[in-house]
Amino acid sequence: MHHKNMAKPVVFSGVQPSGNLHLGNYLGAIAQWVLMQEKNQCIFCVVDYHAITVKQEPEVLKEKIIEVAKIYLASGIDPKKSIIFQQSDISAHTELTWILNCVARMSDLFRMTQFKDKTKVDLEKIIEEVEKRIIAQSETLIVSSEINKLIKELCISLGNIRKSGLGLFDYPVLMASDILLYNTDAVPVGEDQAQHVELCRTLGRRFNSQFGETFKIPEVVIRKEGARIMGLDDPSKKMSKSAESEYNYIGLTDKPEVAAKKIMKAVTDSGHEIKYDEKAKPAISNLLTIYSLLTDEPMKKLEAKYKGKGYGDFKKDLAEVVKKFLTDFQERYKKISDKEVEKILEDGAKKAELIANETLKRVKEKIGII
């Protein structure tokens, strides 16, 4: 059962209004969404309920919601073609989350790598190890030092879990609700979020098998180039808005001259050859990816252009490319008023709510509460 405006494939994605959105968010996600608008019915959300899984300053959060919506618009997301809305404006998101919480299992969520990263816990793995060792040792009834070590690890892990917020643990279920509410066909995400879309698929299928066909099961779409733009100060880690050093990322609202300085300070690899090789030359490969995606120049062409030249020349040119991109982007950004954004979010919420409420009604009928 689909909404009448939904003849085209439905694409859903969103960005949290927390921290500074950066070049990695733009190249890895938003620029891809812009291209998807032509052939798809796109729904883009400012996921403010996801942002509050960690502490936010209320006044800053308010500003960031508007800022993210402006970034969508300045990037080329067109409210005439796409639905843009604020997650918290539609209560169906949290209602469906509760229903899906009753279908989800703790083990589904313990597997999520983002939870493991943020709490430094891989509880599933430790429990499996303890069980294996205990079974192996049970005949002799001697508890080995290995088991003792694992039990200590288990206690530390449980201590970390007790301190972590429930929202941080459960937000993949909220993400599943975001996606399933809109009969979504495709979810464009970065590699780090692909696992959460897999959970969404699992929960959708589990609900369908328990209560009958209800949800459309979406596909994951990961951009090949630029899916992961790495940190300028450390190419082994993803560019991140919560990085300790400001030299890790280029913010979309950074002054162009500041961004150029960050490029000039970016780490490089040993040797002098400007060549794309993720394993041997991760730093220069990351900079080449940024260059290629911002200019649409193929990687091979860039390699040929800088054959025999040094890192200094290459970084100088890339700094200019980034400067030009940010200057143009920020010019568009500054032209958008807060009032305009509020109106677009309000209109978007009205359109999104019709679809979300229809899905939620179907779900409530299936589980027997209406």
What does each model-identified segment do?
Residues 21-30, 41-43, 47, 57-64, ...:
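Structured ligand/cofactor/substrate-binding pocket environments in proteins
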Residues 23, 194-195, 201-370:
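Conserved nucleotide- and phosphate/pyrophosphate-binding catalytic cores
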Residues 5, 9-12, 17-176, 330:
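N-terminal Rossmann-like or analogous alpha/beta NTP/dinucleotide-binding catalytic cores
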Residues 41, 106-110, 181-188, 292-302:
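Short helix-capping/linker segments at secondary-structure and domain boundaries
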Residues 53, 181, 185-188, 333, ...:
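Short amphipathic alpha-helical segments at helix-loop
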Residues 15-17, 48-50, 185-186, 243, ...:
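Short, histidine-centered active-site or binding-site loop motifs used for metal coordination
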Residues 13, 86, 183, 233, ...:
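Pocket-edge structural micro-motifs
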